[in-house]
Structure formats: C-alpha cells, structure tokens
Amino acid sequence: MAVCIAVIAKENYPLYIRSTPTESELKFHYMVHTSLDVVDEKISAMGKALVDQRELYLGLLYPTEDYKVYGYVTNSKVKFVMVVDSSNTALRDNEIRSMFRKLHNSYTDVMCNPFYNPGDRIQSRAFDTMVTSMMIQVC
Amino acid sequence: MDAPEEPQPPVVYTMENKPIVTCAGDQNLFTSIYPTLSQQLPREPMEWRRSYGRAPKMIHLESNFVQFKEELLPKEGNKALLTFPFLHIYWTECCDTEVYKATVKDDLTKWQNVLKAHSSVDWLIVVVENDAKKKNKTNILPRTSIVDKIRNDFCNKQSDRCVVLSDPLKDSSRTQESWNAFLTKLRTLLLMSFTKNLGKFEDDMRTLREKRTEPGWSFCEYFMVQEELAFVFEMLQQFEDALVQYDELDALFSQYVVNFGAGDGANWLTFFCQPVKSWNGLVLRKPIDMEKRELIQKQEATLLDLRSYLFSRQCTLLLFLQRPWEVAQRALELLHSCVQELKLLEVSVPPGALDCWVFLSCLEVLQRIEGCCDRAQIDSNIAHMVGLWSYAMEKLKSLGYLCGLVSEKGPNSEDLNRTVDLLAGLGAERPETANTAQSPYKKLQEALSSVEAFEKHYLDLSHATIEMYTSIGRIRSAKLVGKDLAEFYMRKRSPQKAEMYLQGALKNYLAEGWALPVTHTRKQLAECQKHLGQMENYLQTSSLLASDHHLTEEERKYFCQEILSFASQQEDNPGHKVVLPMQFARLKDLHFDPPNAVVHAGGVLTVEITVCSQMPIPVHVDQIAVNVHFSIEKNNYRKTAEWLTKHKTSNGIITFPAEASLFPASQNSLPALELSEMLERSPSDNSLNTTGIICRNVHMLLRRQESGSSLEPPSGLALEDGAHVLRCSSVTLQPGANKIAFKTQAKEPGTYTLRQLRASVGPVWFVLAHIHPIVQYDVYSQEPQLHVEPLADSLLAGIPQKVKFTVTTGHYTVKNGDSLQLSNVEAMLILCQAENRAVVYSNSREECSTALLRIQSSDKVTSIGLPTAPAYHVIEFELEVLSLPSAPASGGDTSVPGTPELHRKQKDSQRAGHCMVTTDHKVSIDCPWSIYSTVIALTFSVPFRTEHSLLSAGTRKYVQVCVQNLSELDFELSDSNLEDKGHATDLRLAPLNTQSQQLIHSKQSVFFVWELTWTQEPPPPLHCQFSVGFSPASEEQLTVSLKPYTYEFQVENFFTLYSVRAEILPASGAEYCKTGSLCSLEVSITRLADLLDVDKDEALVESEDYFSTKLMYEVVDNSSNWAVCGKSCGVIAMPLAAQATHRVHMEVMPLFAGYLPLPDVRLFKYLPHHSAHASQLDADSWIENDSLSVDKHLDDQLDCSSLRSRGSTHSTSSSEHKGLPMPRLQALPAGQVFNSSTGMQVLVIPSQDDHVLEVSVT
C-alpha cells in the first residue's frame, strides 16, 4: 500500500503528513512538496473542466525510479498526495482512486468535527487509524 | 515445381516497402502501362473495412510490382508477410482468337495452375484493348469475345476477375473511364487480399499466443511473428495499428515480468535474467536496430536489449505519428520500469551500469526528439522533456559520487577501476553517432574522464534543468534541484555558490510552511554560513536550529553551544555587538502591577514577563531589558481607561499569541475578516437602494503577499536607543517558561510603550524588535478634585437628603487644618450631625483610615475640616441637606404659588405628566488647593402634586383637594388644613376629613374634602390655601422640624344657577321602553336664582319687566345607546327668575336593551353677535374653541333655526347666520349647572322581533 500519505492545505502547507519508514521521512517530505508543482499544473490545466466533471482524482503526478506519486484535490483545493512504492505492481488506478475516496471521506469527517479548526494540523485519531490502515505495516 | 531449399534472405526493411503484386503475361505491355499505373494507384483513397469490429480506414494503396515467379509464392508454413504477394495479375492484349487459342490460353492455364498449387486465390486478368491494333486487323472478332472466352475459361463464377483496360495510353474520356474502373477493381481486390491474408495471419498469431502457457513457447519467436504484422501495418502506413502490435508485445512482456515477481516464472524469461554486460543505451537514430533484432531472433537478447529494441520501434512509429512528447513520456516510464524490472528479476547489474544506461538513454531520447522538432515546439513542451533532463542529471550525479568525481581529492584507484569497468560496458560508439560531437556516448565518456569535465557536465545539466523547471513554473522542483546543486558545491568547497541555492530553497519551504525541509535546509545553510564565516547569519541560524524541535537533542545542544562559545570568545573584544533577532525565546505573557497599568507619578510599577526559552539547555543571560518609548499625552488617563476595557484582561495579564512556526507566516498574519453590513439609501426619499456586506479590512487581506522576504527577519536589526529602559541583570533562562520581573518608579506623566525586548549574552544581543500587541503603561499626574453628588437618584425637597462628597487629592497632600468652606444658601440647610465620618481611601480603593468630621457653621459659611490624607488618595464623606419649600408668595397675587420660575416649571411638568417639580440650589465651595470657588448645583424635586376640584350636590358645594405622591418614598401626612385667604366672613369651610394623620404611599393619591357654606347669597369667590405637614414614613425621628407643604388656589362662580333634569318615558301606552321604538325624552331646565351679577353679559335680554338670557341645550349620547330623532339641540330664552322652568320634549330611540344611562344634556350660554368688537373676539373664540364642535353647532344652528322658523316667527335670525358675525357658545362654569339626572338609568326591554335591527338616522 502507500508509503506516504499527505494532506496539504489550499495554501500548500501540510495539514497532515505521514510516511513509513520513518527514516526516509525527510525524503518523502521533499517528494510530496515537489509534487505540488505538478498538482498546481494539473489543477490550472483542468481549470473549469475539473469543476464541471467533478473529477477530483489527478492521477499519477510523476513517477520516480522507486516511487509513484498520485494526487487528488478536493473542491476546496485541499490536496491529497499519496506515494506508492513502484515495485508494488498490484496497485492499479482503481485501487488508488478508492484509497483517495476513503481518505477524502475520512478528511470530511475531520472537518465535520466542531472542535476542529479548519486550517489546523489534523490530529484526529480516527483519521490516523485510517491512514495507518492504508500504509504498509512495517514489522 | 521445386521450391528453393534456402529460406529467403530478409528483405531490407525500409520505408520503401510496399505490398508486392506480381505480374505475369505480356511483360512489354506491363512495362508500357507501369508508369501510369504506379502513379494512378495511390491517387485516391479506398475505404478498408476491417474484421473484428475495428473501425474502417481510408487508405492510399501503393504496390511494388514484380515479375511473377513461382519462387515468390510462399511455401506452406512460411509466416513472412512482408514478402507475401498479395495479388497476381496477368496482362494480355490479345485480340485475336487464333493467337489466344495458340499461346495465351496455355500460358494462362499454366499461371493458374501454379497459383492453385499454392492455394492463392488473389489474382486478376487484365485484357488491354488497343484500337490501333484493331484497325490493322479487319477480321477480328468482336472485342468482347476474347474477354468472354477468358471469362469462360478461367473465371467460372468470378467474372469480375477479368477486366478490360481500353486504350490505356491515350488521353480520351473513354480511356479515363476504363482506367478508373480498373483502378477501383485493383484497389478492391488488393484490400480484399489484405483483409483475407492479414486476417488469416492474425488468427495464426493468436493461436500461437494462446500456446504461451505451453513449456516450449518462446517469447522471442512470438515477438518475431507479431512484429511481422506490425511491419505490414507500417508498410500500409497504418502506424497506429503497427504501434498497437508493439504495445501488445510490451504489455505481454511486462505482465510476464510482474508474474515472475509474483513467483509465476516462465522458462523463457530466465534467459532475460542473464547478468547485464552491456549498457550502451537506447538507439533511436535508425528505424530498425537490426543488431538487436537479430539478438532477439536468435534468442540471445538481454532484458535491456529487448526493451531497447521495443522502445526504438515504438519511438519510430510515434515520431511517424507526430507524437514526439509521447516518446518523452514513454521513455521516462520505460527507464523507470526497466530499473524496476531488473530489480524484480534479480538480474545482477554492476554498480553504475544502470546509471550509465539511463543517462545515455535519456540523452538519446532528448536528442532524438530535438532532432525532429523545431525550437518553438520544444520550448512549449518543456514540461514533457524536463523529467528526462532531471533524470539524466540525477544519474550523472550518482555516477559522479560513485566514481569519486565529487570528492575533494578526486577519484582514488578503486574509483578509477570502477570507471574503467563502466566505460568498458559501453562498448564502442555506434557508427551512426560517431560523427556527432555531442553524442550521449561522448558526453558520458568525457564526464567520467576527469573531475573537471564531470563538474562541467553536471553543472550544465543542473542549470539546464533548473532553468527548464523555472520556465514552466515548477518552482519547487527547481528549488530541489538547486538544493542538490548546493550539496554538490558544498562538497566542492565552494559554499559561496551553495548559499544562494540554499537560501532560495529555504525561503520556499518557509513560505509554504514545510517544517522538516525547513529544518534540513537550515542545517545545511548553517554549515554553509559557518564555512563562509558569516558569523551573524550563522549565529542566527544556529539560534533557530537550537530551538527547532525537529532536531535531536544533541544537534540542538550543539547549535546552542555554538552560540555560547562564540559569546564567550568575543568577551575580550568589548564594544562589538552582534545583534540577532530573538528567536530562541518567545514572549508568552506580560503582567502589570497595578493590574490596570496605570500609575501616578512617583508610584511604583512592576512588569513581569513570561519568556518561553526554546533552548535545550539553560542559558545565562547577562541582561534582559525592555526598551520603553515615552510619549506625553494629555488625555492619557481617560484613553487608558477605555483602552483597558478593550484590550486588557482585568487581571492585568496580556497574553501574546503563540506564533506557530509550522504554518507559513502568510497564513498566520492574515487578520480575521471584519465584516459589517452596508445600507445605501437614496438621497431623495430615503428608500433602501442597495444593501450588502462589506469587508472593512480588504486592504489587509488582499494585499500582495510579499514572496517570503519578510519571513526570515532581516539581520540588520537595530538596537533602539532610548532613555527609558527596564532592566534585569544576570538571568538564567531555563528551558521552558521563565518569569522575569521589572520594577520601575514612575516619573514623568505620559504613556510608556514597551517596544523592544532584548537579551544579551556577552556581545551577542538577541532582540525582539516589536512587542505585539502593543503594551503600554501610563503615568499620570492628577489635579485635586471635588465631587458632590446625591446619594440617591434624585434629591427630594422638604426632607433631609444625603449628599456624598468625594475629594480626590491628586498630587495635593491634605494637611491638618485644611477645610472646605461652603457658602450657605437661604433655602437649603446643611444639617450638622454629630456622627459624621470621613473615610480615606488609597488610589486602589483600599480603605486607609476614618476620621470624624469637624463641621463648623456660621451665618454665611459652613466649614468642613478635612482629615489629613497623602497625595493620590480619596476622601469620602456624606452630609445631610434640607431644601426648604420656597417662601409663600405674599400680596394679592395669591393665585400663583411659589416663584415664577417654579411656576413655569410646574406648568411644564404638569403638561409632561408625572414629573416632579424641581428647584435648583447652587452652593459655592472654597477648596484649600485652589483660590477659585467651586460652584455645585443641587437639584431638589418636590415629591407632591396637588389638584383641586369643586363638587356640587344641588346647591351645596364641596371643595376637594387631591395630593399625589410622585416620589418613590412613602410619606405620612398630618395636619391637613384649608384656609380661606380672602378672610371672607360669610364663607365657612367645614372639613369632612376624619384622620389627622394619613399615610400616602409612593405613586398614590390622598383626597381631602371640605364643605363650603356661606351665609350671604350669592357667595363671594373663595381664595384659599391648602397646607399639609409631611414626613417620610420610614424615618422615626427627625432632628429638624419640617415645613408643611402648601398649595394655593381660587374657586369662583360656584353658586348653582340652573338645574337640569332629564327623563325618558316609554311611548304612550307602553309599560317599558323597547328597543327600536320611540320614547320621549323630557328635559326640564330650572332657574334657581333671580338676576345676579354673573348674568350680566351679552346674552342678557331685557324686555319690558323681566330679564331673560339665551341658553343652548344639547343632547349628546356618547356611548351610542340612544338615537336622537329629530334635532338634538336648541336655543331657549331663559327668564332670569327663580323657579323659572323650561321644558323640552324630544324623541329618542334606544338601540340596546338593558339599563341604559340617560343621554347627557349639556347647557351653554348662547351669546349673540351684538357688536363689531364682539364679533372679532368671537372669531378668535371660535377658533380657540374646538373648531369641530363649532361646525357641528353651526349645522345644528341652521337646523334648529330652520325648525324654529317653522314653529315661531324668528325669520330674521336665519338670514343673519349667513353673515360673518356669528353667535358663539360659552360653557357655563362647573358650579353653575347642576344636572340632577346624572347617573340615572332607564330600563329598556328588547322588542319581540329584534333579532336584526336596522336603524338609519339621517
């Protein structure tokens, strides 16, 4: 499954970012941050079409030798970025899509929490558990 | 028919390949036609319908015409498609039956037999007709016969296999037609053949593919078969279809690799797992890389070979399809997947070999694309290429690190060996690029050859990549590459070049709030700055890093120690200051004592701040200081008081907002929306035009975000100089919260603003440039003040009231013997009580002491001795004052009580309703601190309001006085008395009040009644004064005697002159009045006295021996119980004699059943219009009277008079009414008319059928 999952605010600062293994955390931070370039590009390229078709999934942002970075953007321009190991060939587009949808649902739940301040870092345990379930378990 | 044993040599695969069509028969004929044929055939496209539901395509056909040979026909099992003859044509121009029978028929038969033997059914016989030939031979058969014969002989059921081409070399319309028919036929047959043969081929191929699970199946064999199909499609210019073949092969192979990874290995795949020995990259410059193809054919290809070949074919086709950007994209995918596949298949690869392969391939793809696109195209599609650039750069970098080209000392022998091995794997340069100077091969070889060359190539690549990223707006990617470059520079010991890139990247990360990259980059920057010797920057970065929680404890300690050791080193160099922004510590809150942060001059103020140190270890600070800005503001106290309620918590603690460094500053510093509603009204009629919400701080919200320049505070911080500094020396800041208290004695009055917080460690000064929100304290100096205010809401006149004196000493110190001198006012007494105490409070409202007041009164002055009190204290005491009721007015003007001023107020207040009458007393006070007197006005309210009224019972008269208590207090009334002021001897007032003492509650009234008797008729006017003693009901004992409350009034004309009596009688014969039926109303007006003085007015008519006066009566029923039928009013002449009675009869109709009150009968004096001056007056009085009633009376008048004119002979009066002078009505004074039937009721019973009663009264 995913090795890094990030939720990024409209203003491009991370609301939530988790990666595994933790040693390469920094690398993933750089990777996710860089991928925002492509996210921005795709959003502006899609422009109105995106709004009309309500297609939130941005697809593969860019592949690297070892990882594939996928993107997803909500209507409020909150971005989800997921990094998947390239060697994990079992993950097809459809699986990625459904993972994003799951992530989006969980994020919506977080936003619905009246005690959550939009724009704050996400510290919800439920969200954390969900993300954990989508990441590789390092044993 | 012996077929040659040797397999046919491979055809040269170039784009010149065309489908093969064989020609048999008359070769000379064909040669003559060939140029036209080859030119005409591709001219028009033909629709190719495809099997398997594939979309039909328009296709331009071309053919390679070759002479028919039996060897050309494929043998059984030969899968070659490129050499496959798709159509066989036999040419003849025979027109002679004899010749046909002799030679042509045999030849045709032989040809047909060969075709049949190879089961080829795609053939065509062309008969060329030539008019010229026909003319030569006269006995020729009709031309059709030869064709018929051929058709008959060879084309059984397939007559379309024989076509006629007439005069092919002429330029006539018939020729054209015949050509067209022929070409169409030829194209159709060719396509039929394609469909059939390709279909068959595809079927075979599919069959072969389905066998892939069988053990002996070989991917390479299958590859060659499917590629054959791809070739044919390519030959037919169907590049899309050709590409599909390769994509299918690609997918098939990829799937096998994936399956292999999942443990499902195919035997043939193990062959591809042989160790990589050659990594010479992709070759894209030839349409077909025959070397690699041969390797595949021989089943000797490695994974990289297969992939390279496959991609080179895909690349070629994509370029034919004008899709170069897809090449770039696919190339990147290919390179990534190859690396992955090699890993997955666990192929042994020498270190660096793949890097070489990827590097070469990237450059090869880029060069290939650049070779076929122009500059503009490339520039607009950088986004597709930049990935390859950055990949190539990455690989070159890792090669550089691998071969020791990045290290300072250069490569060692081990590195060199590795380099040699890598170069060996490249093999020799390929011939097609040998002459290109910038070939990937040469580049790589050069880059690996020396440290300098590597640096050059690496920098070239990096800069190109950064430039490309920047140009397409991928700033983040550009920054990341820049950071890599910075790392490279750091290794090359050129930190000055690295700094720029690090700063750029750091700014980017800070702006977007990415904590981890910020920390990492900052760490690199710190190292860079240290190398550069930028001490201030380094210390600043260090202080940031020392307080960065993303670093380990050790790292933070290290950076903290760096600062401290710098500080200790520089101690011997006094005067040199290093000013740094304070980032290691955060100001958390600030606490003032006194809490309101207001202190009087000379007072002591304490400021306690809480500073959160983020340092990992305790830091000893030489001094902590707060720079204070002083400004003189005159209105400081009030401003501060207002400000306090707004900004400061009541406990004097100011909390500074936590700056979460995680979020970008742009996010934090944005103020909240300040929305307010906006209504815009039209200026003319004030109607609402627009409404909306406006944002008041748009300028704050929408201003352009400075691109992070303000995020990293500029190092050029200045220490503010100022005389006012709060200091605290030698403080050790522990990690976490530290409380530091500053104490200061206030000096000059004014506002002090806390500006800078700074902490010094040796020569290092940490400065918090601005304390935000603004923190201020105020020092004030106050003039002494005296306040006098009533203790209750309002002071009541007549009873003792408490007044509070407040002396605010300000800067004045009250000495022993200081006193307030109050000038006495006549009507206000200051009551001196024995137990008056003064209380002294401190500035913060704490009670200090109490003292007895010394009050000394003289005639004019009351002196109050003040207790001693220090400056900025408050003395409070209370005094009782009594406002005496104003002296009763003397003399003849007795109708007006009190002073004129008072009277006016009374009038006003009566009009306003229940307001109390007030009197003001002005007291002038001399204070010891001032030479001027203070004048204080005290307002007292009279608690009562009094009204009188005259009551009649026949001829007996009563005076009623109503006293209303308007205050909130209850009073006890006593000794009520009504006294005739006129001292008329023949008038007597007999009180009917029993109680001498009476309680009057708040907002309630008490009535007093006296009967008025007189001895002489008519009685004179009564002028009297009402007085009543009062005291507050709650007070038990009053020390002073209170003056009674008085009220003066006058009663006149109270003698009864007329008695009115009304009676309602049922209709004659009826027992009761009934609703709806007429009843009679009898009104009798009786004169009770003879002519009196009061009757002597204009209405008086003197005729012969008796006097009469004119009266008007009017029957009014305000409650609509009665309908008056006929006229309701009339004028009567009343004789002025005792017991003279006038009776009026009227008809009224009850409208309701029940006990109904009688209608009112009103009596007016009817004044005629005698004189001109009277009429003038009249006009005024008409107006002054209720105009509505005037009109009404006028109508009545007319009505009455017309009626009267019928009854009597007063015809003149009617004409007079039209003139301007009109008669007027005057109400009789209340006492003169007594209505004896007031309050009487009459019983009305409902009529039997009065469910609905309609009465219309006109």
Swiss-Prot record, chain A:
InterPro entries: Longin-like_dom_sf, Sedlin, TRAPPC2L
CDD domains: TRAPPC2L (cd14854)
Superkingdom of the source species: Eukaryota
Keywords: Cytoplasm, Endoplasmic reticulum, ER-Golgi transport, Golgi apparatus, Transport
Membrane-traversing stretches: none
UniProt-listed Gene3D superfamilies: 3.30.450.70
Keyword Transferase: no
Keyword Calcium found: no
Location relative to the cell: Cytoplasm, Perinuclear region; Endoplasmic reticulum; Golgi apparatus
Pfam families: Sedlin_N
One GO BP: vesicle coating
GO cellular component: cytoplasm; cytosol; endoplasmic reticulum; perinuclear region of cytoplasm; TRAPPII protein complex; TRAPPIII protein complex
Quaternary state and interactors: Component of the multisubunit TRAPP (transport protein particle) complex, which includes at least TRAPPC2, TRAPPC2L, TRAPPC3, TRAPPC3L, TRAPPC4, TRAPPC5, TRAPPC8, TRAPPC9, TRAPPC10, TRAPPC11 and TRAPPC12. Interacts with the heterodimer TRAPPC3-TRAPPC6A.
Family: Belongs to the TRAPP small subunits family. Sedlin subfamily.
Its biological purpose: May play a role in vesicular transport from endoplasmic reticulum to Golgi.
Protein name in UniProt: Trafficking protein particle complex subunit 2-like protein
Species for this entry: Mus musculus (Mouse)
From Swiss-Prot, chain B:
GO biological process, one term: vesicle tethering
Record note on disruption phenotype: Gene-null mice have smaller total brain area compared to wild-type animals, with specific reductions in the size of the corpus callosum, regions of the hippocampus, anterior commissure, and internal capsule. Only white matter structures are affected in mutant mice. There is a loss of myelination in these regions, but oligodendrocyte numbers are normal.
Annotated spans, Disordered: 888-913, 1201-1222
Modified residues (Phosphoserine): 707
Record keywords, A-Z: ER-Golgi transport, Golgi apparatus, Phosphoprotein, Transport
Keyword Phosphoprotein recorded: yes
Predominant place of localization: Golgi
Transmembrane segments: none
The protein's name in its UniProt record: Trafficking protein particle complex subunit 10
Protein's gene: Trappc10
